[in-house]
């Protein structure tokens, strides 16, 4: 059973403003990751986050997606996304 992908309100607002081909690419990457969440070469742990609430980042071309994995509820919660050059983790 795979994980379910959810967006925060802010991430959802950013996501809908992206061009359609970028949205499709991000959706595919998140869906692939949700099937096997702990084995993906373009995912790294974000440094500086509290140990009880770790965040991860995924590289999708020139875009970055930051998310949390909520294991007890099988949810991948997308916190933020955007282009690499103006993205804050």
Where in the sequence are the language-model features?
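Enriched for short, Lys/Arg-rich terminal
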Residues: 2-4, 9, 13, 17, ...
């Amino acid at each position: 059973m795979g994980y379910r992908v959810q967006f925060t309100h802010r991430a959802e607002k950013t996501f809908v403003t992206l061009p359609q081909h970028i949205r499709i690419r991000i959706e595919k990457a998140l869906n692939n990751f949700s099937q096997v969440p702990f084995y993906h070469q373009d995912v790294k742990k974000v440094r500086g986050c509290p140990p009880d609430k770790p965040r991860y980042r995924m590289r999708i071309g020139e875009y970055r997606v930051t998310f949390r994995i909520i294991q007890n509820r099988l949810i991948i919660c997308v916190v933020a996304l955007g282009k690499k050059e103006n993205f804050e983790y």
